[in-house]
Amino acid sequence: MKLSIFFVLFFIAIAYCQPEFLDDEEDEVEETLPVAEEGREKSCITWRNSCMHNDKGCCFPWSCVCWSQTVSRNSSRKEKKCQCRLW
């Protein structure tokens, strides 16, 4: 029991005496995460012709949605479009 109290007080003392140590780690994580996600978003947000090859799990946690649309108003030709969406 005394040993567990010692360890609790020891860790509290470390966290209290060196808060900048914990803050530095959090800042590093915050700095690297947006860069990684931004790169992923740029490579993933593209129009697709199908949802078959969802490289790198680009749509996760969303889903790949496909639909057909006409090429122009006067045309009867339809084109299949796919995109990652929340719904």
Curated annotation (Swiss-Prot):
Residues 1-17 form the signal peptide. According to the nomenclature proposed by King and colleagues (2008), 'Gsp(267)' comes from the species name 'Geolycosa sp (strain A267TDLS2-KZARNA)'. This species has been reclassified since that study, as indicated in the work of Oparin and colleagues (2016). The keyword Disulfide bond applies. This is Omega-lycotoxin-Am1a. Belongs to the neurotoxin omega-lctx family. Transmembrane segments: none annotated. Residues 18-40 form a propeptide. GO terms for cellular component: extracellular region. Keywords: Calcium channel impairing toxin, Disulfide bond, Ion channel impairing toxin, Knottin, Neurotoxin, Secreted, Signal, Toxin, Voltage-gated calcium channel impairing toxin. One of its GO terms (molecular function) is toxin activity. Expressed by the venom gland. Its main location: secreted. It comes from the Eukaryota. Modulates Cav2.1/CACNA1A voltage-gated calcium channels (P/Q-type currents) in rat cerebellar Purkinje cells and hippocampal CA1-CA3 neurons. At saturating concentrations (>10 nM) decelerates activation kinetics and slightly increases peak amplitude without affecting deactivation kinetics. In vivo, does not cause death when intravenously injected into mice. In rat models, through its activity on Cav2.1/CACNA1A, has an ameliorative effect on memory defects provoked by hyperstimulation of N-methyl-D-aspartate receptors (NMDARs) in the hippocampus. Disulfide bonds join 44-59, 51-64, 58-84, 66-82. It is found in: Secreted. The presence of a 'disulfide through disulfide knot' structurally defines this protein as a knottin.
